[in-house]
Amino acid sequence: MDLPPEVDELFDDANGDLALGELDQAVAKYRRCVELMPEFFDGWHALGMAQMKSGHFPEAIEAGKRAVELQPNDQLAWSSLSLFYVRDGQIKEAEAAGVKAKILSWGGKVKKEE
């Protein structure tokens, strides 16, 4: 997916902020990326990770759900969503997401939920 220059620059800046531990700035920039480009899988996944690192678990879960909606056969997205659920204490949901990641690791596919 070709990113518009503004989104590409924002995403790079957000990655730099995340690397420096500037989580609030990273979250704001990732959020802006997905506002500008709602189908940007990497933006949603990165937003979820930054939200988790910030301790905002419900927000991380929402971003993670959006990522797996966009790419339901991405093993890392399901693994991340499972982690977000664990951090939020939602063990049943974490296990369900973890199973989907495991299925993908075995070469299976996950049906896109309607």
Language model segments and positions:
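TPR-adjacent "capping" and linker segments in tetratricopeptide-repeat scaffold/adaptor proteins
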Residues: 1-9, 112-114
